[in-house]
A protein has these predicted regions:
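Short-chain dehydrogenase/reductase
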Residues: 80, 88, 136-144, 167, 179-187, 216-217, 241-244
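Mobile, glycine-enriched helix-loop/loop "lid" segments at the mouths of ligand-binding/catalytic clefts
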Residues: 174-200
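Flexible, glycine-rich beta-alpha linker
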Residues: 119-120, 137-138, 162-183, 208
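C-terminal substrate-binding subdomain of Rossmann-fold SDR/epimerase-dehydratase oxidoreductases
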Residues: 193-316
Length: 316
């Protein structure tokens, strides 16, 4: 099977692309390399450099493909609040271009990279796929709109579609695949440490056990495995949505405790104001994906943070 992976040179996309290739899939990487890195795709021959908002480029990249895994997107929550037009243009407009190209090139399978940011704030112990969606940020709104587009166009066109709602992704399979975004908590801490600064905790006054946000963390390699099983499921699945997390919540302070253990340092974090668009608590219920796809995460929090730090130390 020939699979187009948009955003395939990104942090998550590279892990997904390599796993697909290891499992016998023919992979075409589509990336504009604005955030993706060439070093992550050095073992791929079929690379299409293009912008997801360029309809003609997307159409050309679709030639000869059997399925799509769509990860290409802008993803900084704070930036989406200050510049929502950029996010709607790129994330929703790009998804529209992709669906149009699929229709024109008779490609009828897609796995979409969605987000837990689509959900309404919740006090539930674990969020289920059927729970209310009312995103706090434009980023989350673009993911929800893209899900809806994929579902509705899929129904009209006869596509098989699955949207995977990621929770917080961390870790790395190898050095060159590490997360360089600096928007996510763990790489942001690494950057502050290397610069000799105290890392920040954004908000210590949330209604949680220690005042900091609670999040569900998943190892990026476990997430890549979820894409693989979702792709296989497209042979029978018509229109699916699945949470992808560990099913366990960790506070930001607990993450800092593990970071200090893995890095063997004292980080001395300082508390700052809340970031706009952040929910107090987001923990996944993963019962549906366990039942329907037979997928379960494997990595512990220690393994996630250890692998992230190993990649950070080895990065050039």
């Amino acid at each position: 099977m020939k699979v187009l992976v948009t955003g395939g040179a990104g942090y998550i996309g590279a892990h997904v692309s390599e796993l697909l290739q290891e499992n016998g899939y023919s992979v075409r990487i589509f990336d504009d390399f604005s955030n993706g890195l060439e070093r992550r795709v050095k073992n791929f021959k079929d690379i299409f450099e293009g912008d997801i908002t360029d309809r003609e480029a997307v159409l050309k990249s679709m030639e000869g493909m059997d399925a799509v895994i769509h990860l290409a997107a802008k993803k900084a929550v704070g930036e989406s609040v200050s510049n929502p037009l950029k996010y709607y243009t790129n994330n929703v407009g790009g998804t529209m271009n992709l669906l149009a190209a699929m229709s024109l090139k008779n490609v009828n399978k897609i796995v979409f990279s969605s987000s837990a940011a689509v959900y309404s704030p919740s006090e539930k112990d674990a969020i289920e796929e059927s729970d209310p969606t009312d995103p706090l940020s434009p980023y989350g709104a673009t993911k929800l709109l893209s899900e809806q587009l994929i579902s509705k166009v899929g129904q009209a066109e006869g596509f098989s579609t699955i949207s995977l709602r990621y929770f917080n992704v961390v870790g790395s399979k190898k050095v060159e695949f590490g997360d360089n975004s600096r928007d996510n908590l763990v790489p942001k801490v690494f950057a502050a440490f290397k610069e000799g600064k105290s890392p920040e905790i954004y908000g210590a006054d949330y209604p949680t056990k220690d005042g900091t946000c609670i999040r569900d963390y998943i190892h990026v390699q476990d997430l890549a495995e979820a894409h693989l099983v979702a792709l296989k499921q497209l042979d029978t699945e018509v229109d699916g949505v699945y949470n992808v997390g560990s099913g366990t919540g960790y506070s930001v302070k607990e993450i800092f405790d593990q970071l200090e253990e893995s890095m063997a340092v004292k980080l001395n974090p300082v508390s700052s104001a809340r970031r706009p668009g952040d929910s107090p608590k987001l923990i996944a219920s993963i019962k549906k994906i366990e039942k329907d796809l037979g997928w379960r995460p494997k990595a512990t929090l220690k393994e996630m943070i250890d692998s992230a730090w190993a990649a950070e130390k080895g990065a050039k």
